[in-house]
Design a protein with these regions (language model features):
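Beta-lactam-recognizing serine transpeptidase/beta-lactamase-like catalytic domain environment
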Residues: 1-181
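Ligand-recognition elements built from short beta-strands and adjacent flexible loops
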Residues: 140, 154, 182-287
Length: 287
């Protein structure tokens, strides 16, 4: 998927790509009524070369906040309007029960056309019906969604084997009433796919949202594709230096082949933090 977005970024060019980034509100505070909001980190346009253009196109090298994500996705699915988010709906006098102040939807700008928004809603619904978001599928309801994987940064460098797995969902996708953003910071002992981490949890939250908002069933949702196309991948744990029993516990999802004698792992293949598919074999050298 990333090479495809690199190609799209190149076709758009840096001026147009970063114009959309700006219009969707990234790199600046949303103005939400919460203290301590961050702006995120976006490249300055005059410092964007071919590498920065390519990495930005698939979401690496930049930093955004969850509320920016929600505001931007809301604009994608609501017909194209970026709105100022708010937490408090109104303030009520405790003695008189009268509304002192009320907060209403405040449109900031039109970012994309109604037609583009409609296409995107269909595409997001396809992700849940036929793609990596199938674990969020709820029969009778039109759910749109997109999985996400962000590599974590420490001391200015990307960390190996440390990720934020996320899932963004909208319900119902043809006439959105709610957007959900769910993230898990560095999930452990699980497949390296949001399809297996955040998406099943998101489905349970979506059921609560449907109940709370009394969203009605529809009979025109996209039919779920029952063939699972995603390959399950894992990050290989580091077991070098551990004893045989401890290594066996950490590698319980894999087939293990031992060589050498002794009880301490001195070498492993594949190396720690590499990505491998489910049912792969890991070879350990004991000493």
């Amino acid at each position: 998927m990333n090479p495809g977005f690199v190609k799209l970024g190149q076709l758009l060019g840096k001026e147009r790509l970063f114009s959309y980034i700006d219009k969707f509100g990234f790199g600046k505070k949303t103005g939400v009524d919460l203290n301590g909001e961050g702006e995120g980190i976006i490249f300055n346009l005059d410092k964007v070369g071919k590498v920065e253009l390519s990495t930005t196109a698939f979401g690496q090298g930049v930093s955004v906040t969850p509320i920016q994500q929600v505001a931007a996705v809301s604009a994608v699915v609501n017909g194209g309007y970026l709105n100022k988010p708010y937490i408090v709906k109104n303030i009520v006098d405790n003695d008189t029960n009268t509304v002192i102040k009320e907060y209403n939807k405040t449109p900031i700008r039109k970012v994309i056309s109604n037609k583009t928004s409609s296409i995107m809603r269909y595409a997001l619904e396809s992700v849940v019906a036929k793609g990596g978001g199938k674990s969020a599928y709820i029969e009778g309801y039109r759910i749109g969604g997109k999985t996400g994987t962000a590599q974590k940064v420490k001391d200015g460098k990307y960390m190996v084997g440390n990720y934020i797995m996320s899932f963004m969902a909208v319900v119902p996708s043809n006439n959105p009433e709610a957007v959900l953003y769910l993230a898990i910071d560095n999930p452990k002992n699980t497949a390296l796919l949001s399809s297996y981490t955040t998406t099943p949890i998101a489905r349970r939250i979506l059921l609560d949202i449907i109940d709370a908002l009394d969203i009605k069933k529809q009979d025109n949702e996209q039919e779920k594709d029952l063939e699972w196309t995603d390959k399950i991948t894992y990050i290989v744990p580091n077991v070098v230096g551990k004893d045989k029993d401890e290594a066996k516990k950490l590698l319980s999802d894999f087939t293990i082949e031992y060589s050498g004698s002794g009880n301490k792992v001195v070498e492993q293949s594949p190396k720690a933090f590499e990505k491998i598919e489910q049912d792969a074999t890991i070879r350990l050298l004991l000493e």
